[in-house]
Amino acid sequence: MKKIFFILGFLVLSISSIACPICGCGGGNLYFGLLPNFSSQFLGIRYHYAEYHTQLANDPTQFSTNHYNSVEVWTGFNISRRLKVFGFVPYYANKQVDDDGTSFKNGLGDITAMAQYQLLHTTKRTNSNKVLDQQVWFGGGFKLPTGGFNVNLKDTNTTIADINAQLGTGSLDFLLNGLYTISVGNFGVNASATYKINTTNHDQYRYGNKFSSTCIGYYKIAVKQHTISPNIGIGYESVSSNVLNGAKVQYTGSHVTTALAGVEFGFNKIGMGMNVQLPMQQNFAEGQTQLRLKAMAHLTFAL
């Protein structure tokens, strides 16, 4: 597929001429979703999968299917009743299949640390004697450039596909996050939003800022001393264009809306769950790239 891409070696003089249809999904991701129902700290492992397919509109024989796999260690601690901190350490094992063959890229991704402060927590009884609980959290954090950004922008064979395949952004990036939860008895809704602010790396390349949000409804079913919580929801993600030397990179930036369904299990000090996201509406590389599937599974332990 590389043979049809415009080279990046001339970007400094003519960045507007880039024509690369590979999806703008590089730069890493952070997903909160439904947090474990533990009263204290937790430690767990999560698996994330995403699949994208690209096919050139003017030459269908040129294609690429990208499989993004990551295994992530995540943890959370209660510093106080109102303050929580989180850590995320991802390892990526990515695979790309295209008309030129198959390639792999594995390694440590960018490590993220965040803190959340509870702005509001109210609890009261409804007329039907059910407990109505509401919480509002707000926080922020940073992402360290621990993942590799090993691409030579002066190499005439380098493409945007190579940039999106990098394990990290090569930059110190920042995040803002808000979370609202409301539950009445066994039914609840969790809404979260995260804005990721990317900075320019040492190669003068900056991935686009990313806004992501989810709204998930769940119902908690008690089975003896355990719980099962099926959930459904909707997700939205919008990414602005990448920038090189102060100019926007063509065919980067995207937005996608997904439908989500999953289930969470609680066994005393053990939590596990999974979900699947399917696209309802999307726009990557002017329609030449399509998200096919996202999925997540986790196993988490209370400490």
Residue ranges, per PLM feature:
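Surface-exposed strand-loop-strand hairpins of Gram-negative outer-membrane beta-barrel proteins
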Residues: 48-70
